[in-house]
């Protein structure tokens, strides 16, 4: 459960990320593909090389979904319902991959914003990514 302090930290961090969200999303995807090669199996039709336009475009989709979630912290299930359906019924993404991407998102944000990445912010973002992952996998059951 996200506390009010967590929500404030998430919103403040996302405000600082601003126009870099798509760039960070792509970087986190690249980190995921390099660190956890099995995640590549969901993207057989993508050029997964560094700087690929397809990875950048998907990174922007990830960032846009997270931006949507930040704007709906009080009701993540409704805000992410369509994405949950997509990942559960059409894409059939193994739920563990959300944890792997979440970890890579945390690393990416920490690298770009080390001064702002306090323990409280780290904890809030970790809880947020976990909550988003839970919603995205909720329809698997």
UniProtKB/Swiss-Prot annotation:
Similarity remark: Belongs to the globin family.
Quaternary structure and interacting proteins, as annotated: Heterotetramer of two alpha chains and two beta chains.
GO cellular component, one term: hemoglobin complex
Modified residue annotations for Phosphoserine: 3, 35, 49, 102, 138
Domain Globin: 1-141
Modification N6-acetyllysine, positions: 16
GO molecular function: haptoglobin binding; heme binding; iron ion binding; organic acid binding; oxygen binding; oxygen carrier activity; peroxidase activity
Keywords: Acetylation, Heme, Iron, Metal-binding, Oxygen transport, Phosphoprotein, Transport
N6-succinyllysine carried by residues: 7, 11, 16, 40
Sites where the protein binds O2: 58
GO biological process: hydrogen peroxide catabolic process
KW Metal-binding (keyword) present: yes
Taxonomic source organism: Paguma larvata
Pfam families assigned to the protein according to its UniProt record, in alphabetical order: Globin
Modified residues (Phosphotyrosine): 24
Top-level taxon of the source organism: Eukaryota
PANTHER family linked to this entry: HEMOGLOBIN FAMILY MEMBER, HEMOGLOBIN SUBUNIT ALPHA
Entry binding sites for heme b: 87
Tissue expression per record: Red blood cells.
Protein name, per record: Hemoglobin subunit alpha
PTM-bearing positions, type Phosphothreonine: 108, 134, 137
């Amino acid at each position: 459960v996200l506390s009010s302090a967590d929500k404030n930290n998430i919103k403040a961090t996302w405000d600082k990320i601003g126009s870099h969200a798509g760039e960070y999303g792509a970087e986190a995807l690249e980190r995921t593909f390099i660190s956890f090669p099995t995640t590549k199996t969901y993207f057989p039709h993508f050029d997964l090389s560094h700087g690929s336009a397809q990875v950048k475009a998907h990174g922007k989709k990830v960032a846009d979904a997270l931006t949507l979630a930040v704007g709906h912290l009080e009701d993540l299930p409704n805000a992410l319902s369509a994405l949950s359906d997509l990942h559960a019924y059409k894409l059939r993404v193994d739920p563990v991959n959300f944890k792997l991407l979440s970890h890579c998102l945390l690393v990416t944000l920490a690298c770009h914003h080390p001064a702002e990445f306090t323990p409280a912010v780290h904890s809030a973002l970790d809880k947020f990514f976990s909550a988003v992952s839970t919603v995205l996998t909720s329809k698997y059951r």
